[in-house]
Amino acid sequence: MEHMMKEGRSLAETPTYSVASVVTVLVFVCFLVERAIYRFGKWLKKTRRKALFTSLEKMKEELMLLGLISLLLSQSARWISEICVNSSLFNSKFYICSEEDYGIHKKVLLEHTSSTNQSSLPHHGIHEASHQCGHGREPFVSYEGLEQLLRFLFVLGITHVLYSGIAIGLAMSKIYSWRKWEAQAIIMAESDIHAKKTKVMKRQSTFVFHHASHPWSNNRFLIWMLCFLRQFRGSIRKSDYFALRLGFLTKHNLPFTYNFHMYMVRTMEDEFHGIVGISWPLWVYAIVCICINVHGLNMYFWISFVPAILVMLVGTKLEHVVSKLALEVKEQQTGTSNGAQVKPRDGLFWFGKPEILLRLIQFIIFQNAFEMATFIWFLWGIKERSCFMKNHVMISSRLISGVLVQFWCSYGTVPLNVIVTQMGSRHKKAVIAESVRDSLHSWCKRVKERSKHTRSVCSLDTATIDERDEMTVGTLSRSSSMTSLNQITINSIDQAESIFGAAASSSSPQDGYTSRVEEYLSETYNNIGSIPPLNDEIEIEIEGEEDNGGRGSGSDENNGDAGETLLELFRRT
């Protein structure tokens, strides 16, 4: 009985109510978390936030990966701890803490391996390791060391998920604060043309004054120092938002009534999928940090300042892009006073790739999470932590720096990156509303399925569809709250081209939106391999709740303004 009390009771010798109580608590907690994640995902699908739902799925994949690692490590820990190597391979230079911190002398460590294991292993693990390894040999990784590693990986994954969620939450709150500016811009676009031009020119002048009036702005070296200081004053101003918005709409030939703010929100949701999750380069970075974290280097202390340096570097670059655009507008105003506006292009960014800044932000968030995870691990997973906690100044500076940088990056740098990276040469796929994209995918999918059952001939060069075949495509919903159904009916092989025929014959900026749809359709057609010719009109009929009948050729006469072209629907979205 005394030997049993020292080593602990087995499951067979434990009362059943104790085992049942532990299982009940574990099942209840896991079920509660699983239901919460399920409800949140269901709400995202209901509100048609497909990008955020995809990000949630990626977070679930990360948690599943951590669970798999924990399962494998827990099941193989006993086997790994039985791998014995010579004690001479354990050089104290590669210890996290020095021997003095543990209070262990080198002679005792080398000559009395069993006693050393007894000071660092649980009693049950020591008993097995000492008999298996023998004199002069010891486990490659002890059982307790594997348990501590398991705790660290678990804390790292949970901390990274929480930091990613906090970053996106703060960034979204900042971006949503710009909605009032977007509403003003749309009202200006719908108001008198002369008044609109006057206000736009005023905003452009204010934008140039804020970013190009300082004497350092004309010096190619001092402007970097100026941009470095400007990033501390906060996010963008109203004049900056108006100028960048106008440049984006003009660059991509979009109507001035286009909702640029909703486009940024959709873009942010898409980019969230890239921020969430620990990619394999980040895992490699974490492994390297664990490997080189030897005593005397204070590696974790020095790398804790890497996020602060990168945040300032990214913020300076974003401010430099805005300042360069303002200087170009200023030069245009001195030359030709009419038509001065920003000119977005990829050449403004490093290596012509705006996405590099997003990757740096992803690394910043991971490094901050890694810093906090190591601190929690030291408190929770290591009993003898004298070498980790003896310098309170270093610990405090690491924690304060990590928290401040995380808040600064989330609330300032990420929103600024979202709007400034739109100044590249290409637009994101979010330029078209998600409901329209889903409907276009549904349309192309049905075209492909129908073509298999009709007398159609499809090839890489040509594609024809039977004129007598009528294809009804899925619902086009302009909002999740609408109860009416918008359907597309194609009555002949030449009924689809009028969307783009009207765009080709018009020079209005609004028709540029149709070209975006045409690009999207072309990419989708290339993916499915069947390209129906676009020659005639596509008619959209809106069926209300009271209309339960079929659709005929005389629906325009019966419903008045119910019929509309797909081009008009694209413009409204």
UniProtKB/Swiss-Prot annotation:
GO terms for molecular function: calmodulin binding. Residues 35-62, 173-271, 315-359, 421-573 are cytoplasmic. It comes from the Eukaryota. It is a multi-pass membrane protein. It is found in: Membrane. Residues 434-455 are annotated as: Calmodulin-binding. Keywords: Calmodulin-binding, Membrane, Pathogenesis-related protein, Plant defense, Transmembrane, Transmembrane helix. Pfam families: Mlo. The keyword Metal-binding does not apply. The keyword DNA damage does not apply. GO terms for biological process: defense response. Residues 542-573 are annotated as: Disordered. Residues 1-13, 84-151, 293, 381-399 are extracellular. One of its GO terms (cellular component) is membrane. The chain crosses the membrane at residues 14-34, 63-83, 152-172, 272-292, 294-314, 360-380, 400-420. The C-terminus contains a calmodulin-binding domain, which binds calmodulin in a calcium-dependent fashion. Belongs to the MLO family. May be involved in modulation of pathogen defense and leaf cell death. Activity seems to be regulated by Ca(2+)-dependent calmodulin binding and seems not to require heterotrimeric G proteins. This is MLO-like protein 4. It comes from Arabidopsis thaliana (Mouse-ear cress).
